[in-house]
Amino acid sequence: MNLIKCYQTNSSWYKGAKRNSTPVGILWHATAAGNPTLKRYVQPMETDANYQEMITLLGKNKYGNDWNHIEHEAGLNAWIGQLADGSIATIQAGEWTTTPWGCGAGSKGSCNGYIKTSSSRTYNGQHWVQFEICDDGYKDKQYFDKVY
């Protein structure tokens, strides 16, 4: 596995996330967007020491709609998808012990680290590591086999 760190430090998720949470499971999800490129969701900050290296690896998101912005409250521990050269990689977007915010909640709580109590939610100090797969619209079996 090609694991690359590119923490999304400018996102509201990263800035407000609980740290030192205990991972108790893994949740994977697909974007369902028909776009396999990691650059759509992951971009470094221009102030990052390795900014140019990361842009070369990922490619530049020319629309600026990646998740490393203050207005994106959602955030995940990792993304799996295509680099600029077409190869597959996993981008770690936050520490494994950082509570993600990538799924909803139900009557029993959430994989985001919260349990439901009557009319509110309470942080329980545990979470499921969450990663998102940048799907290609489920058109290419070879791509599917590589990312899953």
Residue ranges and their predicted role:
Residues M1-Y148:
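Active-site-adjacent loop/helix surface patches within enzyme catalytic domains
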